[in-house]
């Protein structure tokens, strides 16, 4: 059995925030043939299809380990895969590893404290950007990031589905990607705004010319 955990915070106020990208990927992996396993002892939303378990802990990020431990103790899966955001990776980057340090991620810290760190991790970059780390992870994706998020989640979904049937090293070779630096995203957004402004200016000039021609015709 394989337990796949997507980390995030419960509640509408945290929906679609950067810290919840693990939840988003679990939603992508869910299909109609998964059955919901409702039990308060798991402290999360748990779904099962054959030998695959999908978990979205509902404990809030800092206590994610409580939910993971409860499911791990009950089902005793052979493998655990944890999907989470990573501030230190460029937006859209994908990295795969087993064990290692938490990198300051409180959800990973919580899991490590309760079951150890001998599990596989899918790290999805959200980019550090500027400002306080806590504010960044709890912020929503901007318009430019939102446009790219569909493709990022689609690739990450394929990676997890591949990882289920293959080892972490092969998955890393096939699906690791660098992502985009925040300044590139900012430039793309600026370019789009500039193009939009140029288009609006051209339309304005065109309308002025039409108006001038119309006035000239009336005078004649």
UniProtKB/Swiss-Prot annotation:
Provide the site residues for: Discriminates between blocked and unblocked aminoacyl-tRNA. 9
Site feature Stabilizes the basic form of H active site to accept a proton: at which residues?
Answer: 85
Q: Please list the residues that bind tRNA.
A: 14, 60, 62, 106
Q: Which GO terms describe its biological process?
A: protein quality control for misfolded or incompletely synthesized proteins; rescue of stalled ribosome
Catalytic activity reported: an N-acyl-L-alpha-aminoacyl-tRNA + H2O = an N-acyl-L-amino acid + a tRNA + H(+)
Entry's Gene Ontology cellular component terms: cytoplasm
**Principal place where this protein is found?**
cytoplasm
Please state the Enzyme Commission number of this protein: 3.1.1.29
Q: Its encoding gene is what?
A: pth
- What name goes with this protein? Peptidyl-tRNA hydrolase
Q: Which PANTHER family match?
A: PEPTIDYL-TRNA HYDROLASE
Q: Which UniProt keywords apply?
A: Cytoplasm, Hydrolase, RNA-binding, tRNA-binding
- Name the NCBIfam families for this protein: pth
Q: Which family does it belong to?
A: Belongs to the PTH family.
**Stored CDD domains:** PTH (cd00462)
Q: Where in the cell is it found?
A: Cytoplasm
Subunit composition and interactions? Monomer.
Which molecular-function annotation in GO is an example for this chain? tRNA binding
TM segments? Answer: none
């Amino acid at each position: 059995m394989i337990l796949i955990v997507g980390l995030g915070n419960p509640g509408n106020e945290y929906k679609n925030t950067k810290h919840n990208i693990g939840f988003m990927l679990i939603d992508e992996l869910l299909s109609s043939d998964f059955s919901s396993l409702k039990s308060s002892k798991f402290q999360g939303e748990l779904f099962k299809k054959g030998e695959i378990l999908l978990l979205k802990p509902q404990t809030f990020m800092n206590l994610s380990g409580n939910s993971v431990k409860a499911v791990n103790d009950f089902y005793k899966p052979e493998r655990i895969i944890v999907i989470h955001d990573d501030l230190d990776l460029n937006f859209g980057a994908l990295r795969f590893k087993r064990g290692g340090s938490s990198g300051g991620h409180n959800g990973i810290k919580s899991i490590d404290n309760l079951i150890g760190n001998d599990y596989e991790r899918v790290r999805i970059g959200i980019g550090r950007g500027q400002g306080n780390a806590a504010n960044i992870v709890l912020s929503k994706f901007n318009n430019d990031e939102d446009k790219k998020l569909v493709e990022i989640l689609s690739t990450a979904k394929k990676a997890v589905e591949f990882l289920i049937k293959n080892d972490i090293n092969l998955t890393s070779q096939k699906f690791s990607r660098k992502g985009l630096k925040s300044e590139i995203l900012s430039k793309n957004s600026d370019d789009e705004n500039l193009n939009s402004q140029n288009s609006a200016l051209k339309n304005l000039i065109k309308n002025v010319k039409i108006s001038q021609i119309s006035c000239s015709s009336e005078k004649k």
